[in-house]
């Protein structure tokens, strides 16, 4: 019995229920990662695996960076926990001050969470509460997009548009609608960067405004580049149209930048890259380079100030988490910002994007490739699905890549799209 077979036998009855995984398949054919360094993972047998997806779109600066590791070690040895409610610790305020200059113009305040899913649900609650404190409590409707991914909590799943993530859970949150996605193989296949066709799809939001009465809509949430569902790059002018419609009707625009942020497009935030400033931005992942769970919601100054109008002895936002602004996470975040700044990683993508684009599109003539999409250092290769076995070809590609020592990300929807980020 070889080592991997021995591991499989050990894992067969493991109590661990793995997330977003085919548990039975994995336990028969385990793919374990024992350590990491730089761009590579290492298996227990010592095989070197290229991390083609930056962990789960989060290890933007590479694995086990000494400056970040040292910051975490100092942090946990100094202050392992501090209550975030009615108390605080210096690193939370220091980290907020460190991030603030990187935010898009007009975005000034931040609320710390522990994950992208928490960031999304926090942003949705902030949007609803904002309208209520301004006397517009009738604005309760939330708008998402088909094929959108906004985490796995109830709010994020409800506004998300990936069928496989939604159907098992029933009705979820009420008062949610979706506009169409922008994926169009007929018009935009093999586009380099932003596709030319599809900006008019933003008008779906205007139609929903007319259907429901815009005064009932609280917020629209969208990923600037929809990554988890297969890398759908926004058509030219699309995000600008969404911003215009939201402004016209007093609807808050939320950018889910859990993946897009922290330099993946060559700017700290996708909002800067596209020149469209939302009202709220969600983030996580790269905020600590994936070392310690953390997320945040960034917001415009007027949103923050709307909550500051009540009595000073009142809690302005009855929301938060035990681990919000955790001191060790803040230490990791500060170490991460040091690495980003010292190595110019938030803007370096601009130097590499053309090389990455050419490399991705060089695979155009490979068997079964029906589309390649890219922007910045994000790309996806869409494969023709097998008849009667949607998703199988993409999973096979994922497994074979691992055997060839390359890590890939199988998308979370029902097409064959191995993604790279």
Predicted ranges, named:
Residues 1-421:
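Conserved N-terminal phosphate-binding loop of PLP-dependent enzymes in the Aspartate aminotransferase
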């Amino acid at each position: 019995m070889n080592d991997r077979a021995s591991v499989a036998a050990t894992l067969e009855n493991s109590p661990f229920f793995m997330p977003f995984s085919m548990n039975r398949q994995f336990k028969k054919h385990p793919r374990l990662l024992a350590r990491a360094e730089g761009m590579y993972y290492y298996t227990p047998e010592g095989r070197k695996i290229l991390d083609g997806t930056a962990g789960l779109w989060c290890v933007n600066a590479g694995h086990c960076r000494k400056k970040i590791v040292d910051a975490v070690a100092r942090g946990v040895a100094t202050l392992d926990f501090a209550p975030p409610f009615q108390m605080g610790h210096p690193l939370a305020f220091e980290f907020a001050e460190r991030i603030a200059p990187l935010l898009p113009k007009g975005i000034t305040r931040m609320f710390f969470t522990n994950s992208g899913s928490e960031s999304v649900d926090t942003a949705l609650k902030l949007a609803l509460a904002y309208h209520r404190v301004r006397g517009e409590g009738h604005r309760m409707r939330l708008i998402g997009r088909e094929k959108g991914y906004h985490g796995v909590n109830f709010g994020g799943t409800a506004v998300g548009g990936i069928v496989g993530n939604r159907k098992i859970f029933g009705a979820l949150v009420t008062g949610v609608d979706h506009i169409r996605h922008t994926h169009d193989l007929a018009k935009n296949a093999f586009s380099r960067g932003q596709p030319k066709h599809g900006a008019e799809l933003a008008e779906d939001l205007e139609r929903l405004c007319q259907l429901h009465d815009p005064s009932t809509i609280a917020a629209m949430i969208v990923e600037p580049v929809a990554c988890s569902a297969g890398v759908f790059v926004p058509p030219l002018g699309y995000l600008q149209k969404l911003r215009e419609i939201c402004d016209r009707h007093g609807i808050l625009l939320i950018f889910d930048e859990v993946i897009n942020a922290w330099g993946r497009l060559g700017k700290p935030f996708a909002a800067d890259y596209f020149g469209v400033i939302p009202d709220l931005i969600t983030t996580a992942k790269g905020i600590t380079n994936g070392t310690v769970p953390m997320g945040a919601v960034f917001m415009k100054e007027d949103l923050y100030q709307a909550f500051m109008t009540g009595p000073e002895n009142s809690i302005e936002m009855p929301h938060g988490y035990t681990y919000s602004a955790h001191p060790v996470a803040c230490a990791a975040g500060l170490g991460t910002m040091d690495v980003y700044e010292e190595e110019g990683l938030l803007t370096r993508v601009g130097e590499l994007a053309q090389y990455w684009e050419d490399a991705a599109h060089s695979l155009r003539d490979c068997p079964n490739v029906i589309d390649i999409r890219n922007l910045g250092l994000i790309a996806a290769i869409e494969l023709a699905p097998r008849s009667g076995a949607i998703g199988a070809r993409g999973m096979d590609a994922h497994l074979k890549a691992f055997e060839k020592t390359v890590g890939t990300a199988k998308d979370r929807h029902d097409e064959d799209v191995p993604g790279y980020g």
